[in-house]
Amino acid sequence: MEGRGPLATSPRRRWLLLLLLLPHSHQRIQDPPAVHLSSASGQGPVTIMTFDFTKMRKTSSSFELRTWDPEGVILYGDTDPHEDWFMLGLRGGRPEIQIHNHVARLTVGAGPRLDDGKWHQVEVKVLGDLLLLTVDGEEVLCLKQVFGPLASRPQPVVRIAVGGLPFPPSSLRLPLVPALDGCVRRGSWLDHQAQTSVSALSGSPRSCGVESQPGSFFPPGAHAEFSLQDLPQPHAEPWAFSLDLGLQLAAGSGHLLALGTPENPPRLSLQLQDQKVVLSSAWGPQLHLPLVLGAPLQLKLAASGVTLSQGPETEILALPLSDPGSLLNLWVQPHARLFLGALPGEAASASFCLDGLWAQGQKLDMDRALNRSQNIWTHSCPQSLGNDTDTTH
């Protein structure tokens, strides 16, 4: 009866005991932190890697993606930026692949929407002349005869860029806005053993550790500008123009928006002051409403005045009809702007989250702004305002 005592165990049980006794950190190596896909400069990728394809034994890349942003570049690869490149991005929230080489030139969209703020597992695999795209374990795209042999390339180098393009977006087969307000984690890029270089762009990328919700977040001092010529135009008879803001979070004091030109004080402005929303004009009078977060804030502009309303509260600001500098004349000036956030030169402490901004009922996209601060979260907001939300890209 040797080996049948109370301490005797089968080999399988001994392995289970060892696994249970190991510290948790030994059971799984800690994952590196998630990386935000917006670079500090707002231009180009966050990481560029090169690989010697003569040494590659693995021709797939996988990662997890989380975003509320429906459009942007996730991954780009090439052996020649003019003649042989590949791009994986989002358009309308769904994956899109663009391929440009001597074998195939195509743009294909496939798969489910990924802009829901959840983590999604994505894998891109090249098998000979085939490309496979898998999302959350399900194959959503199989492209055949789209690649030639790597051995035919003049240089044995494959370049991978994460979160951007090494050339202008106009050079894509179907241009899109490259900046993607999203996070990537657990990335495995081609064959690590064949990697010859890796470079991360300078600057402090935004943290992915903050829980987010859909919207657009302006940290203190952030600003964006839209040309009035690029916005939906006012109704002609009678003249009317509307702006609607979904103000979800707000703190501090400073401008929310203004109408005017860069070289002059604004004709009309909306500010945060002491938990109030204050509407001011260049003609002196102003009015205010108590700040109510979550309730739509609406500005209705007419020739005779401006109506500010939020929920049941409504105030009307009268405007002079004969002034040549009236609001109506702004729309015929080529440099007239809709300013969001801090005005040029303003030391503002206001930070706020918009879950939407509409001009004449049409939602505006921060990626389409004439110019903007790079620390604006274009398609996401923190769940609450605090010190950890003032980070920049």
UniProtKB/Swiss-Prot annotation:
Disulphide bridges, residue numbers: 183-208, 353-381
Compartment(s) where it occurs, according to its Swiss-Prot or TrEMBL record: Secreted
Functional note: Functions as an androgen transport protein, but may also be involved in receptor mediated processes. Each dimer binds one molecule of steroid. Specific for 5-alpha-dihydrotestosterone, testosterone, and 17-beta-estradiol. Regulates the plasma metabolic clearance rate of steroid hormones by controlling their plasma concentration.
Originating organism: Crocuta crocuta (Spotted hyena)
Keyword annotations from UniProtKB, A to Z: Disulfide bond, Glycoprotein, Lipid-binding, Repeat, Secreted, Signal, Steroid-binding
Cellular component, GO, one term: extracellular region
Subunit note: Homodimer.
Occurrences of domain Laminin G-like (ranges): 35-208, 215-381
Designated name of the protein: Sex hormone-binding globulin
Superkingdom in the source lineage: Eukaryota
GO molecular-function terms, A-Z: steroid binding
Entries under Pfam families matching the protein: Laminin_G_1 (PF00054)
Glycan attachment sites: 371, 387
Signal peptide stretch: 1-27
Keyword Signal: yes
Main location as per UniProt: secreted
